[in-house]
Structures are given as C-alpha cells and as structure tokens.
Swiss-Prot record:
<dbReference type="InterPro" id="IPR020456">
    <property type="entry name" value="Acylphosphatase"/>
</dbReference>
<dbReference type="InterPro" id="IPR017968">
    <property type="entry name" value="Acylphosphatase_CS"/>
</dbReference>
<comment type="similarity">
    <text>Belongs to the acylphosphatase family.</text>
</comment>
<dbReference type="InterPro" id="IPR001792">
    <property type="entry name" value="Acylphosphatase-like_dom"/>
</dbReference>
<feature type="active site">
    <location>
        <position position="36"/>
    </location>
</feature>
<feature type="domain" description="Acylphosphatase-like">
    <location>
        <begin position="3"/>
        <end position="91"/>
    </location>
</feature>
<dbReference type="Pfam" id="PF00708">
    <property type="entry name" value="Acylphosphatase"/>
</dbReference>
<dbReference type="GO" id="GO:0003998">
    <property type="term" value="F:acylphosphatase activity"/>
</dbReference>
<protein>
    <recommendedName>
        <fullName>Acylphosphatase</fullName>
        <ecNumber>3.6.1.7</ecNumber>
    </recommendedName>
</protein>
<keyword id="KW-0378">Hydrolase</keyword>
<feature type="active site">
    <location>
        <position position="18"/>
    </location>
</feature>
<dbReference type="InterPro" id="IPR036046">
    <property type="entry name" value="Acylphosphatase-like_dom_sf"/>
</dbReference>
Length: 91
C-alpha cells in the first residue's frame, strides 16, 4: 500500500474536479480525500496499490474534469500515513 499527496493547480475548482476525482478513485479502488484549497488549488491524498495508484495519478494529471484543466501536480509520497477506508470529498 502506497500513499501520495498531490496539490493540483489549474482550472480545478468549480468544474466538477473533486466529484470526478472521487469517481475515478472509486473505480480504481483508491482511498483517500480530495478538497478545495483557498488558493484555488485542489489537494488530494490517495492511497492504494502501486499499479492502480499510477493509473489514478495519470488520470489526475490529464484532468478528470472535461470542463477544467491541470497546469501542474506537485506529487509527494507519504510514509506512516493514516489508513483510509474510502475516498471522500472534504468540504
């Protein structure tokens, strides 16, 4: 099990980004959270097996929302992370 954090910038708020991110995560068996940040970016914590997590990251970089676009993803691996049981949108 691997955990990553992502800070995603671009047109990622107000375009269904969090909802589509949650749908992709659930389809791939990824757990974690997604939330909007005050600076207009989106933060994601994603946890899963290596291959599904790689697919998830690729989909995020390609922008899961057709109405938005991703300019940059700051990706970090986390050790000793909290264990998630589902993927949820944090408000």
């Amino acid at each position: 099990m691997k955990t990553v954090t992502m800070k995603v910038t671009g047109l990622v708020q107000g375009v269904g980004f969090r909802w589509t991110t949650q749908m992709i995560a659930q389809d791939l068996g990824i757990t974690g959270t997604v939330k909007n940040n005050p600076d207009g970016s989106v933060s994601i914590v994603a946890q899963g097996e290596e291959l599904p997590l790689e697919h998830f990251i690729k989909k995020i970089k390609a922008s899961p929302s057709v109405a938005g676009h991703v300019d940059h993803v700051d990706l970090n691996t986390v050790s000793d992370a909290e264990k998630f049981t589902r993927f949820s949108v944090v408000y």
